[in-house]
A protein has these predicted regions:
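Surface-exposed intrinsically disordered loops and tails
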Residues: 2-9, 147-150
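N-terminal capping segments
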Residues: 54-129
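...with weaker cross-activation on analogous glycine-rich loops/strands in unrelated enzymes
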Residues: 130-198
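Active-site signature of cysteine proteases
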Residues: 187-220
Length: 220
């Protein structure tokens, strides 16, 4: 608009530029392995166990807030594998522990992580075993048992005290939780689990429970 109130149009020259950008996509697992320290990478592998918008933000563990179960009156059925009652007794002695200390610090973490696998590894460590030792169910625990020929699927019928039991809560094919087998009465499997609602508890499940992913079979 000019001084007399008349509108007019003016063409103003300008320069413009086109920016061509090439983007490279990398999976987060690749970035993690490149940028994280060994301790951070191990923690990341633990966190990967639970994915998506779930009650457990990070993986490993059970959201079960129910009380520990009573084994009074349970009649266990012995299979052909001997198992190890001593490691079961060690695990049972920790029932009532809340928060997972000393299990995650024994493993080497400086702060709390989801600690079900640390608990199982700690129990084996108290027996003088250096292996199996794992903080992640899916990426460390199961591969160890499979690579040593010590893996049994959900329908494996000869579990023994001291075996590891792995769970897949959301049935996505990845193990989310692990505990120690106390024994079976022929229809149910009884366990001691760390990080079950952030506590050590005795639990039991039908042997056909669909969330049982399989068993790590210990050779004593």
């Amino acid at each position: 608009t000019d001084s007399e109130g008349n509108s007019y149009t003016v063409q103003v020259p300008y320069n413009y530029y086109i920016l061509n950008v090439k983007l490279t996509s990398k999976p987060i697992s690749s970035v993690a392995s490149e940028l994280l320290t060994p301790e951070q990478l191990e923690m990341y592998q633990v966190y990967r166990q639970t994915l998506g918008n779930k009650p457990l933000i990070f993986g490993g563990g059970s959201p079960d807030m129910s009380n520990s179960e009573d084994l009074t009156g349970v009649v266990f059925v012995n299979g052909t594998r001997p198992g190890n009652q001593a490691v079961v007794d060690i695990a049972k002695s920790q029932v009532g522990n809340v928060g997972g200390q000393p299990f995650w610090s024994w493993y080497g973490f400086n702060s709390r992580v989801e600690w079900c696998a640390c608990f199982v590894s700690w129990c084996y460590g108290q027996m003088g075993l250096s292996e199996p030792r794992f903080a992640s169910c899916q990426s460390q625990g199961i591969p160890w048992f499979q690579s040593h020929g010590q893996w049994g699927g959900r329908d494996y019928a000869n579990i023994a005290p001291g075996d590891a039991i792995f769970f897949d809560w959301d049935l996505d094919g990845r193990a989310d939780h692990v505990g120690l087998v106390v024994g079976t009465d022929g229809s149910r499997v009884y366990t001691v689990e760390g990080n079950s609602g952030d506590a050590c508890k005795i639990k039991s499940y039908s042997l056909t429970y669909e969330c049982i992913k399989g068993y790590g079979l210990m050779n004593w």
